[in-house]
């Protein structure tokens, strides 16, 4: 049987679901190929979305018309805004989700998407003709033909799970690996390598002594991830915290020779920022305890996730160690922790559009590009799906710059620097994080998305209304003066210096001790100005306050970004044979040849390419 589409997406994880939905919204006839339609966007590890920098990515996906934010809001069971004690540049939303409901909400979203079919099958052969990806063959003998193919296979390509000395092929617990698809990709010159990740035990809550743990409730100030979600009261479930102890550590150390990570059984690299419990013990031998977080998997299940105890130690060792923790003395588990090795592909062989440099019309997104995390996968999937659809129509690709989105930072890092370990996004990776806040993803991206065709008119109108209200509040604060006699008593109550002369409300908001809400309690006209008929009034006021309070920082960072744009506007791909440019350092020639950057800006970010190398290229381009 032959089925014909514009875009085929291989893999129904977080990257694949966003890619398929995005391509279909662009008008491309799309097919999502997945081995299990009942596990779409499965949360293979922790049942949570967001976190530091990751929450910003989810809001960006939403601002671009993607689905992850909507699905998260519909299935949240706890919410927290991380980094509240720091500046808004690094505020990051995080939600615990109901794992089962998350899958079915994604299924509902995809079922309602026009131009999208789902095919339950396994891709086994990539079809390439004349250097172009034109489809795939499946294990059921179906030929799927298309103009573009997006690979989002997660950890399933030659996946191998480890628990102690036991090794089981699989892409996830009790799910088969895809064993031959990698070879059909690498025969076209695409480089594959291996990475490793892991996950902890899943615990039966009925066996936990919660009286020996500390409750960690959510925040009452609930922010939705989606700009389209109406504010609501969130019934929240608590998480719980406890710690390992010396007995736990002694038990694990006594069996370290049975750990696949330390006996040579696993040779691939795991995520630096999500280490296994055995790695923590070996890396930090002086620490007497490590924190553990017990997270609910859903409202209607007894299954709980033990964050902080990822392990591939033998099953009995994991259980013996956990029973040394008072809260887990009678522990029962649903399954052990395990490590998994899998194939990924060198992301420096991709264009900034996530299209392969070697096979036209072939796109990659998610963990197959060497990243880790649902959010990083979803962001890549969104961009790969959009660009696959644009490719089908012969249009120029859609690429986000580093000052436009964390997604832009992510993809630029992957395609420019490559990876030697699973890549995780942090706010520290973004040099323009004051511009890339979680509150303004819609301001940065929704208009672009609407013009491109991936954001609806409803979403665009929603943003325009919000923009008008924010600008009105900022303008009012800039133009309205207050006199010392009208405000000084309140300023003293708020713990800030009284005024000697009249000033604008905006200059008062700029004080670190003051907020719009505080000032509104003392200035009746400001209280009236903050009132809107928008359901998300609190979000609008917060956005206006950030723009006022951090105006100088925002303007300064924007100027720096605009200077960098000059290098981004100088396209150098195809202009040089770098091997012949002896004015450039040997390492610089080698790296430039391998990456073959699109712009001078991208070239400047390649490790090993020096500023003097960039100056040489700049002089040559001016000639």
Model feature map: region roles:
Residues 36-38, 54, 182-319, 411, ...:
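An anion/pyrophosphate-binding glycine-rich loop and adjacent beta-alpha core
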Residues 429, 446-615, 619-623:
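Extended, charge-enriched "interface" segments that sit outside catalytic cores
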């Amino acid at each position: 049987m032959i089925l014909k589409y514009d875009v085929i997406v291989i893999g129904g994880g977080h990257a694949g679901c966003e890619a398929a939905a995005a391509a279909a919204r662009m008008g491309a006839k799309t097919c999502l190929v997945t081995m299990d339609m009942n596990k779409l966007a499965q949360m293979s590890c922790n049942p949570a979305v967001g976190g530091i920098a990751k929450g910003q990515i989810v809001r960006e996906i939403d601002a671009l018309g993607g689905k992850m934010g909507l699905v998260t809001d519909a299935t949240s069971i706890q919410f927290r805004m991380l980094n509240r004690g720091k500046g808004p540049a690094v505020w990051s939303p995080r939600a615990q989700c109901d794992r089962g409901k998350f899958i079915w909400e994604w299924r509902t979203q995809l079922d309602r998407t026009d131009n999208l079919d789902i095919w339950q099958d396994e891709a086994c052969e990539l079809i390439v003709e004349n250097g172009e990806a034109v489809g795939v063959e499946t294990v059921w003998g179906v030929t799927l033909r298309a103009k573009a193919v997006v690979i989002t296979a997660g950890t399933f390509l030659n996946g191998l799970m480890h628990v102690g000395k036991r090794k089981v092929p699989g892409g996830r617990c009790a799910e088969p690996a895809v064993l031959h698809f990698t070879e059909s990709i690498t025969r076209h010159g695409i480089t594959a390598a291996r990475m490793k990740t892991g996950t902890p035990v899943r615990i039966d809550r009925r066996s936990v002594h919660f009286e020996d743990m500390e409750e960690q409730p959510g925040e009452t100030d609930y922010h939705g991830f989606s700009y389209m979600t109406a504010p609501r009261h969130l019934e929240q479930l608590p998480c719980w915290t406890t710690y390992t102890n010396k007995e736990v550590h002694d038990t694990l150390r006594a069996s370290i020779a049975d750990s696949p990570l330390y006996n040579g059984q696993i040779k691939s690299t795991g995520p630096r920022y999500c280490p296994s419990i055995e790695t923590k013990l070996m890396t930090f031998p002086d620490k007497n305890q490590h924190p553990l977080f017990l997270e609910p998997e859903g409202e209607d299940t007894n299954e709980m996730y033990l964050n902080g105890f990822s392990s591939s130690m033998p099953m009995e060792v994991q259980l013996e160690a956990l029973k040394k923790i008072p809260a887990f003395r009678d522990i029962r588990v649903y399954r052990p922790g395990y490590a998994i090795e899998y194939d990924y592909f060198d992301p420096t062989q991709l264009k900034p559009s996530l299209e392969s440099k070697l096979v036209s019309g072939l796109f990659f997104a998610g963990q197959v590009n060497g990243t880790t995390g649902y959010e990083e996968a979803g962001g890549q999937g969104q961009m790969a799906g959009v660009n696959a659809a644009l490719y089908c129509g012969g249009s120029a690709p859609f690429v986000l710059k580093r000052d436009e989105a964390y997604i832009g930072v992510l993809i630029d890092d992957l395609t420019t620097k490559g990876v030697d370990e699973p890549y995780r996004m942090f706010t520290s990776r973004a040099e323009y994080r004051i511009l890339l806040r979680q509150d303004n993803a819609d301001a940065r991206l929704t208009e672009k998305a609407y013009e491109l065709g991936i954001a609806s008119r409803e979403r665009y109108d929603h943003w325009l209304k919000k923009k008008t209200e924010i600008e009105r509040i900022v303008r009012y604060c800039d133009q309205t003066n207050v006199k010392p006699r009208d405000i000084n008593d309140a300023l003293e109550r708020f713990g800030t210096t009284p005024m000697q002369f009249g000033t604008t409300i905006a200059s008062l908001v700029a004080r670190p001790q003051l907020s719009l809400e505080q000032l509104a309690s003392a200035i009746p006209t400001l209280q009236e100005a903050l009132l809107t008929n928008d359901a998300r009034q609190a979000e609008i006021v917060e956005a206006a306050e950030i723009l006022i309070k951090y105006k100088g920082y925002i303007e300064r960072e924007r100027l720096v970004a605009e200077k960098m744009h000059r290098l981004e506007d100088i396209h150098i791909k195809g202009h040089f044979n770098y091997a012949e440019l002896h004015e450039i350092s040997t390492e610089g020639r080698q790296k430039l040849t391998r990456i073959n950057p699109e712009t001078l800006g991208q070239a400047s970010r390649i490790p090993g390419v020096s500023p003097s190398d960039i100056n040489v290229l700049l002089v040559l381009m001016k000639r």
